[in-house]
């Protein structure tokens, strides 16, 4: 089976993460699982790639992080969750428009 090159998809990691965060706030492991599931296991994002994207997007104002305490029963651990901002929604829309154009151009060559 052919794997997707990380170089090819690198510019769209943010788009995939923002897509997931539009539905609801989430944390790293859950986002990673969602990307794997939605891509039908054709793309598995590396942990370092994921957390680098979180850092970059938070710095750019596309997402916000917050810590969620474990439930009232005390089970589990604190997790850092991420949520999309209005600026992140705008960025997502721009990246989707960019993808349509990119796909149109590349399809002329394959």
What are these regions (language model features)?
Residues 1-6:
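Short, Lys/Arg-enriched N-terminal segment that forms or immediately precedes the first helix
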Residues 48, 55-59, 76-78:
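Basic/aromatic recognition patch in beta-strand/loop cores that engages polyanionic ligands
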């Amino acid at each position: 089976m052919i794997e997707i090159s990380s170089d090819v998809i690198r510019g769209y990691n943010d788009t995939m993460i923002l897509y997931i965060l539009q539905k609801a706030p989430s944390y790293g492991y859950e986002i990673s699982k969602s990307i794997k599931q939605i891509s039908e296991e054709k793309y598995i994002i590396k942990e370092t790639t994921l957390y680098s994207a979180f850092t970059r997007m938070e710095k750019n104002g596309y997402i916000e992080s917050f810590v969620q305490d474990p439930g009232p029963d005390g089970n589990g651990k604190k997790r850092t969750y991420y949520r999309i901002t209005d600026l992140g929604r705008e960025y997502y829309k721009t990246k989707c428009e960019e993808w349509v154009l990119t796909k149109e151009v590349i399809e002329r060559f394959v």
